[in-house]
Amino acid sequence: MKKISRRKFIQASALTGIVGGIAATGVYKVTEFSSNAEGRIVIIGGGAAGLSMAALLQRWLKKPNITIIDPSDKQFYQPGFTLVASGVYKPKDVWKQQEKCIPNKAKWIKDSVITLNPERKNIRTKNNGEIEYDFLVLTPGIQINWDLVEGITHRTLGEGNAHSIYDFEGAQKTWSAIQNFSKTGGKAIFTDTYTKHKCGGAPKKICLLTDDYMRKQKTRDSGVLDFYTVDPILYDVPHYTPRLEQIYEERNVDITLNTRVKGIDTKHKKVYLERNWSNNENDVTEIVEDYDFLHFTPPMSAPDFVKESGLSWQEGGLAAEGWVEVDKETLIHPRYPNIICLGDCAGIPTSKTSAAIRKQVPIAAKNLILTMENKEPTEKYNGYAACPIITDYGHVLLCEFDYNKNPQPSFPFSIMDMSKEQYAAWQLKTKVLKPLYFHGMINGYGF
């Protein structure tokens, strides 16, 4: 029998514990509660949050009446886009046909929402007219505003070697670009964006994966890698920040803070940036950088129909992009208690990740049913989110935290120092989370 090191044994044991713990938790969650509550439930959005809510509600309600409105043909595992863009996954690994993912007791209207009127409890769709509801689950996801970066559109993504993994085709193009850049060398620029966006760690991941891929190809010396962030710090969760900054320094990747992308000249391969050190709009320095390979993050917001519905925050830091106003603990709208919102569209001060949704779903489902029963919602969400920052092919810095940016380890990793990157977390990211998504989470298990 082949011997394994104590370190590998501990990590393998932790990984086994993750799978077992998730399975046990999922079974317990979906069998502990049932209700006779009735009402027309409409779910806008059939992504991670929408399908998971539908699946769990149909298990918990004895007489479910659930309609899902979503236009998509495919169900994407979006956290896998980074792994497509780095060659770990094949494109076919991260999607399934949507019709095979819709819960069997839910009605699917394959359409887009045009307007939403919470006063009339009414939704107008593009092709199916008006739909009324008693209770609304608002999970439409996020709107990517490619047009807010001058000089490039969704259609022209990839031209001038300017790429983004926030798109399925874009992730595939990014992988080709990384391989080519490793051969040619030059200057690579990676950026985030000034709005809240899906998985804030993704731009950091693809930067570090590009670096590691080049090292494995023995071509790293031929390239210069620079990372630009709009924030005054590389990462805003203190428990994990020191090691992440150290990794960038060790890899010789320069970090520029307080800087955002304004536009891209794909013909001449120039990126136009604005640096603002003081948060004063009059104290802005414009910068132009040449590049050979660019990965940028487009601005994002709530969908237009949400912004026009009156459900968004009207003031504060979450108002600018139209994020839905909800109680950050119960996830219920303060002015319309028959509306609950979770996922990327929710205006809550935490990261927009699949892991956050996984924790929000059982809380939102229970509180919605309590509302249907004319009871006060009692379940509370603590802001848990997780961002597995891939630092190289084989290690992940698993960042788990709450609203207060305190560490919130939910997996059996306490025997390791999770302020540093770990092999077991890489196994979790690449081997466990995708099956958990397709076979557990969107089927109402594994919360």
Question: Model-found features: residue ranges?
Answer:
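A conserved FAD-binding loop/helix module that cradles the flavin
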Residues: 345-375, 379-381
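Active-site-proximal substrate-binding core of FAD-dependent oxidoreductases
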Residues: 369-408
